[in-house]
């Protein structure tokens, strides 16, 4: 075959396999196995330019680059804060879980987005943030949380390493500075933080609006830190939940259509 001729002539790394977020799990797995049989790690798919910053940021916190809870588990949430995502339009079926949480638990939906979207129209609170200022916004929330003692001290003591460094940095983000940087009124930031901290379990959701920045990986590091501070991890209705852009971005990533990991995120 042409592939075998190429392999014999120029070596296995002369070829590259491009997987797809439209693959189902089995197809993604076989694509990775074919690359291994061919003798190359030159394999990738669309997640490289979509959510690679999420994978890097989240994997450095949890050890793997995936959402921590299922989409259906959002029905168990009592607070849902959404950064840079518009699931009412882009994930209309999945968004039914958000609405079910409102119906079942009187869950509060908070949207942080530069645009007023159809998702924001369903929100209890909406913050029109300046693009690229998500980190100051989250540090402002953390500053309020720590100052008021709303953080989960037992969870942090038992489960979290390095939170004292976050506490120290959060002091550099008083509410007035955060309001100036983000363009969100100080009263609204306090209102959002108080509502989210008081309504547990809370889930934090994001999509491309958080990742597609030069600081995308740093953005996706901050989101889990906020959840850890409140003890919203390891519980139904909590977690950090990333909305993907195509049918099976997560599955194709889980099953190894990547040049730097094997199925199940075993690093190379």
Label for each model-derived stretch:
Residues 1-247:
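Cofactor-pocket helix-loop regions in the catalytic cores of large enzyme subunits
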Residues 248-268:
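Surface-exposed loop and adjacent secondary-structure segments within mature catalytic domains
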